[in-house]
Structure formats: structure tokens, C-alpha cells
From Swiss-Prot:
<dbReference type="Pfam" id="PF01018">
    <property type="entry name" value="GTP1_OBG"/>
</dbReference>
<keyword id="KW-0479">Metal-binding</keyword>
<keyword id="KW-0547">Nucleotide-binding</keyword>
<dbReference type="GO" id="GO:0042254">
    <property type="term" value="P:ribosome biogenesis"/>
</dbReference>
<feature type="domain" description="Obg">
    <location>
        <begin position="1"/>
        <end position="159"/>
    </location>
</feature>
<comment type="subunit">
    <text>Monomer.</text>
</comment>
<protein>
    <recommendedName>
        <fullName>GTPase Obg</fullName>
        <ecNumber>3.6.5.-</ecNumber>
    </recommendedName>
</protein>
<dbReference type="GO" id="GO:0005525">
    <property type="term" value="F:GTP binding"/>
</dbReference>
<feature type="binding site">
    <location>
        <begin position="213"/>
        <end position="216"/>
    </location>
    <ligand>
        <name>GTP</name>
    </ligand>
</feature>
<dbReference type="InterPro" id="IPR031167">
    <property type="entry name" value="G_OBG"/>
</dbReference>
<comment type="function">
    <text>An essential GTPase which binds GTP, GDP and possibly (p)ppGpp with moderate affinity, with high nucleotide exchange rates and a fairly low GTP hydrolysis rate. Plays a role in control of the cell cycle, stress response, ribosome biogenesis and in those bacteria that undergo differentiation, in morphogenesis control.</text>
</comment>
<feature type="binding site">
    <location>
        <begin position="166"/>
        <end position="173"/>
    </location>
    <ligand>
        <name>GTP</name>
    </ligand>
</feature>
<keyword id="KW-0378">Hydrolase</keyword>
<dbReference type="InterPro" id="IPR036726">
    <property type="entry name" value="GTP1_OBG_dom_sf"/>
</dbReference>
<feature type="region of interest" description="Disordered">
    <location>
        <begin position="127"/>
        <end position="150"/>
    </location>
</feature>
<dbReference type="GO" id="GO:0005737">
    <property type="term" value="C:cytoplasm"/>
</dbReference>
<keyword id="KW-0342">GTP-binding</keyword>
């Protein structure tokens, strides 16, 4: 199944129906007067969050969506039928953006939530509306108003409580397999994970949280290298980040260097996301001797000047994973309780969330702009003149911002 998390579409609300000009005509009634009815309102376009969807692939192939036009008014004061509204179903966690102004129209974060993205046109008036004491036979009507038309960009972010960060082959997919029922692909080569994977971690019988695994980051990811930069946005709505570090890399590289790369790339992508609660998880502890393991752990802590929680685990043998899962559940419960009872804390987190969203969107927009420049053969925006044939035609733009990966 194709995983698509960004698409561009055009929506058009229905036009309003025209008013009718008609006069009453009956036997023995010489001057029956006007009886033209109003037109019907045009249908509006809504986005609806559907918890059964996890990709925007349907909108990759169908880019134009139009609601029904309102019917024209009829004689004998008959009002035209209202156009049917159009409901476009999208995954929960979808952000809808006006492509022309970059204004965020809304976020769909709860199942069943509806968002109007295009208002239907107002109905036209029939000639009955213009009857007066001085104008007994009006021949005036009004046409229906056109419905809104908008070019939209939709961005989907997975909704998870915990997000995993790390270099390729740090053991993120193995970790999510060990603590949940999710079965992402695991192999001994980089970039095994190509799309985000979600898993539900059940701690007790009635307690659970959702964890998200994204493709690994590499050095230079904030400039577009590798796969992870596109998927960092999926961590924007997580509540806590787990930074996984491989302390027994096959290439015998320094775990401290690897940990530092992730921190640097995260900070370059979004300084505010780097402020999110983050725990250090040192993986593959069963592959080194105890003395060497402790030395490598301390080296990572010293290099990062780490002061937060530290966990030493082995995901494949599940050493330390139960304690980590219980601690995460406890943190999430305490966080939710504090959010409900501490308005200042809630306001602080809301401000942080907004800054993360803004910075992530700005980074991704910059990457899209750079890709557009490369496609047109322009090295810099400063090289574009007023009449250089800059392509703003939505119809011909087959390379919108959608990114497609194939889920195994």
C-alpha cells in the first residue's frame, strides 16, 4: 500500500442556483403577478477525519473535487434544490493549508471532526422577491453566487504519544516490535524503515500508549539528505521522544558521535522540537562487555552533556524494555494530570506545540521551494525575473508536494 502524507488538491464549492422569472397564469385571472422562486444554495466542501484511514493516497490520483450546484428556482414560487455537500475523508492528524496564502485552515485531530474548506454559493432571487406596491410585475432576478474555489495542501501527521529518533540501524524497529504487536521490517542494512510505523504498547490491562517509528536520520538530513527529514514532522505531536543510540555499531563507529548527529539534525530542523521532553535510550547493551558498555554509556552522556533520563536496554532480548514502558506510561499519566490542573503548564505546552508546527512547516516549505527551483533549472530564487515563465499553473503541476513510499 502506498503511504502518502502530503498532497495538493483543488476544491470547488457548488454555485448557487439562479432565481426564476415567472408569472402566474390561470384562467380568468388576467394579472396573476410574479411567482418565480429562488434558486438553491450550492453545496459546500468539508474535510472529515476518518480513523480508518492512514494515508492520503486517494488524493494523489484525484486532485479536483467539486460539490453539487444548487438548482435553479421554478415557477409557482418553487425554490431550487440545495446542492449536496461534498465530504472528503482524510486520516486523523491531517492539517489543511491554503496553498495560495499558506494559512492553516484547520487541524483534524479527532475522529469524526468536520472542517469546512469551501463555502457553497448563495442562491439567486426569483422575481417574486422584487414585487412592491409600485412594481407589480417585476422582471428582475439575480443569479446565484459562485461557490468558493481553493487550492489546498494537506499534510498528514501520525498521532502518537511517543516518537523514536535515531540513526539507521539504531534498533528502532526492533524496539517497537519488542514492546508492541507492530511488526515493522527489520534487517541489517540502513533505511529498512521507509514509512512511519505505529505500535500500541499495553502496559497494564487498561493502560496503553501509541509509539511511532520513523525512518532513520543521517548527517545532513536537515538539508534534505536521506529520508528522515520529511518524517520528522510526524514527531511534532508526540508527547515524549526516545533517542535511541546503538552502543555496539557494526562499523565500530563512536556511539557518542552518532548521538551528537541526531541532536544536531533535530535542532537544525526545529529548535522547538529539540525542547520537547526527550529520553536517552542506549540500545544493544547485550553485545558488549559490562565494562566497555559502561564506558560507552558514560561517553555518550558526557558528549551530549545529558541531564535527562537514561535507559540502557537490549530491544532484541527485551532487557530493560518493560521498565522503560512502565516509566513512559507513568510520565504520560502525570503529564495529562498536570495539563488538566495547571493552566500555566498547559499554556506553556500549547505555545511549544505551536512553535514546533510553525518551524516544521517552514522547513518543509523551504525544501519544496528548493525542489521546485531544481526542477525548473534555477539555482536561486534571486535568479527568477518577472517574466521568466515561472510556472504557477495548478493544472500542469504534476509534481506537487506529495511524497510516496511503498509500504511492505
Amino acid at each position: 500500500m502506498k503511504f502518502v502524507d502530503e498532497v495538493s488538491i483543488r476544491v470547488k464549492a457548488g454555485d448557487g442556483g439562479n432565481g426564476c422569472m415567472s408569472f402566474r397564469r390561470e384562467k380568468f385571472i388576467e394579472n396573476g403577478g410574479p411567482n418565480g422562486g429562488d434558486g438553491g444554495d450550492g453545496g459546500s466542501v468539508y474535510m472529515v477525519a476518518d480513523e480508518n484511514l492512514n494515508t492520503l493516497v486517494d488524493y494523489r490520483y484525484t486532485r479536483h473535487h467539486e460539490a453539487q450546484r444548487g438548482s435553479n428556482g421554478g415557477s409557482t414560487d418553487c425554490t431550487g434544490k440545495k446542492g449536496e455537500d461534498l465530504f472528503l475523508r482524510v486520516p486523523v492528524g491531517t492539517t489543511v493549508i491554503d496553498a495560495s496564502t499558506q494559512e492553516v485552515i484547520g487541524d483534524l485531530v479527532t475522529p469524526g471532526q468536520k472542517l469546512m474548506v469551501a463555502q457553497g454559493g448563495w442562491h439567486g432571487l426569483g422575481n417574486t422577491r422584487f414585487k412592491s406596491s409600485t412594481n407589480r410585475a417585476p422582471r428582475q432576478t439575480t443569479p446565484g453566487k459562485p461557490g468558493d474555489q481553493r487550492d489546498l495542501k494537506m499534510e498528514m501527521k501520525v498521532l502518537a504519544d511517543v516518537g523514536l529518533l535515531g540513526l539507521p540501524n539504531a534498533g528502532k524497529s526492533t524496539f517497537i516490535r519488542s514492546v508492541s504487536a507492530a511488526k515493522p521490517k527489520v534487517a541489517d542494512y540502513p533505511f529498512t524503515t521507509l514509512v512511519p510505523n505505529l505500535g500500541v504498547v499495553s502496559v497494564d490491562r487498561w493502560k496503553s500508549f501509541v509509539i511511532a517509528d520513523i525512518p532513520g536520520l543521517i548527517e545532513g538530513a536537515s538539508e534534505g539528505a536521506g529520508l528522515g527529514i520529511r518524517f520528522l514532522k510526524h514527531l511534532a505531536r508526540t508527547r515524549v521522544l526516545l533517542h535511541l543510540v546503538d552502543i555496539a555499531p557494526l562499523d565500530e563507529s563512536s556511539p557518542a558521535d552518532a548521538a551528537e548527529v541526531i541532536v544536531n539534525e533535530l535542532t537544525r530542523f526545529s529548535p522547538s522540537l529539540a525542547e520537547r521532553e526527550r529520553w536517552l535510550v542506549l540500545n544493544k547493551s547485550d553485545m558488549v562487555m559490562d565494562d566497555e558498555r559502561d564506558e560507552r554509556v558514560q561517553e555518550v552522556i558526557d558528549r551530549l552533556e545529558w541531564e535527562g533520563p537514561v535507559y540502557v536496554i537490549s530491544a532484541i532480548s527485551k532487557q530493560g524494555t518493560d521498565k522503560l514502558s512502565h516509566d513512559l506510561m507513568r510520565y504520560l499519566e502525570d503529564r495529562a494530570d498536570r495539563l488538566a490542573n495547571d493552566p500555566a503548564y498547559a499554556e506553556e505546552l500549547a505555545d511549544l506545540d505551536q512553535r514546533i508546527e510553525d518551524e516544521a512547516r517552514a522547513q518543509l516549505q523551504a525544501l519544496d521551494d528548493a525542489r521546485t527551483l531544481r526542477r525548473t533549472g534555477v539555482k536561486s530564487v534571486h535568479d527568477i525575473g518577472d517574466d521568466d515563465g515561472w510556472d504557477d499553473d495548478f493544472e500542469d503541476d504534476e509534481d506537487g508536494p506529495e511524497i510516496i513510499y511503498v509500504r511492505d
